[in-house]
Amino acid sequence: QTPEYVMIMNEMIHDARIVRIDSAHVSEEIRKWLGDSIGWWEGDTLVIETTNFREQTGLLVASRNLTVTARLRALDGGHLQYSFTVDDPTVWTSPWSGDYVWVKSGERVYEYACHEGNYALGAVMKGARLLEGEAGSK
């Protein structure tokens, strides 16, 4: 975090959302997987408005008109209150909202790799080395 930027990183696939503080949105023709996020402070709450999502966002239902407004506020113990409102007048008849607490885990964020937790990976690698060895002896 700097005075001009806040980064929100998701451990899954290392998605990093860069929030530009006190800035304007980029041209609506520039579309990003995670949208274009700008933010500003309202007291102790960071308000983040995200627009310009790519149409292939991975969301079940969304259009080019999707706007997500989020509010982040620090709580005791290092936790964060996360509130959001989804507005897409092309898809929904009215905006809808939700909120939850991001609980501070105290754990490190590790590099995301699809093989983590795949206990068969050892056998897969052993088989690959065996095939490589056979190919090398020919």
Provide a role label for each language-model segment.
Residues 1-138:
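Hydrophobic small-molecule pocket/channel-lining residues, especially in calycin-type beta-barrels
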